[in-house]
Amino acid sequence: MESLTSASSTSTLLSLRSQFSKPRTPSVGFTHRVKPKLEVRCVLEAMNNAGAAAENDKEVKLWGGRFEESVTDLVERFTESISFDKELYKQDIMGSRAHASMLAKQGLMSMSDRDSILQGLDEIERSIENGEFVWRTDREDVHMNIEAALTDKIGEPAKKLHTARSRNDQATTDFRLWCRDAIDKIVARIRHLQVSMVILALKNEGLIVPGYTHLQRAQPVLLQHLLLAYVEQLERDAGRLLDCRARQNFSPLGACALAGTGLPIDRLMTSDALGFTAPMRNSIDAVSDRDFVLELLSANSITAVHLSRLGEEWVLWASEEFGFITPSDCVSTGSSIMPQKKNPDPMELVRGKSARVIGDLVTLLTLCKGLPLAYNRDLQEDKEPAFDSVKTILGMLEVSAEFAQNITFNQERIRKALPAGHLDATTLADYLVNKVSRVF
């Protein structure tokens, strides 16, 4: 069967060859048919030449030594992360300063090269902060953008900065520094909201409100007691974040790609310079796990749930049916068609955005669940959910504090609501048990 197939193929090829090798007699319109073909071939050749020229113009990647051709534009656009990980520029420059100083101290670069690198990094940082730095997609990520810009600026000394360092340990070092800074900001916002809630409680000292279970009137409680329940929840939220900060505050630098380096580096020096507690003990663990980000996003999700419950309560209390609070105009919005409306939109959005924070956690959990050791490119996708979670929770905390500072409790309406629903039934039952020995 195989020989028949081969024979058939050979016969077909010979037939085609003889057909196209026969001299053709020009006929009417032949030149008109050939001309478009020539034009197409010229266009294709021009495109190929342009592509080759563009290929030659492309900058060689940091990893491009063994490759004979560049990635396509489509692959370059798909794999870049500079569009979002430029958020890490400050932490990346911090890490590079510490690494350069360590290399110089260990004799792996000269002091003059170190000074050139540090000066160049300072100039790049100023350029970024002034909005003058040009982020390039062809340089893939924040690390290569800064390193290539440094090479453009100071030349050969910049190429020594990557000694004893991989983007694997560099990226997770940057990310740990960023998460540490993010935790500090979130905890500060939590404290601000706690203070706002305490002030609100003090302004309404002695006010009794209906307490609810199952959204049914249950027992009378002090408003202060109710507001301080949220303060306690927020205290635990802050505690979780601080615990997370302590666990993630270890330095991955020196782990390199996954197996460390044979060069005589000083991991303790870089760890101390960056404010870490100590270097991480296992190089594979250092570059491959993102549990420190998962823990942060988990803590954010719990905080978001607490804020969502607060938002739900205040939205209910601002309704005509309850009428317990009146938000100021400065924290309310109206309707485009109903002129009487005054909506507590900020707290509705706090309630809504909690879904987004929880979704960011689920995204990262799903990303990490099937990855073999050690590093995988999938982990490039860990940044955006983390950035979004932190940005969203900061906004939720800030607007909740703003709302707390701009609401009024309608004390007369609350007092009129107290008699309904037999709120003192439990107190009466307790009295009967205590005074007349009735079983209840």
Map each language-model feature to its residues.
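N-terminal chloroplast transit peptides
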Residues: 1-35
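Short, well-ordered beta-strand elements within core beta-sheets of diverse protein domains
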Residues: 99-109, 225, 294-302, 427-436
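Hydrophobic alpha-helical scaffolding
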Residues: 86-89, 110, 136, 140, ...
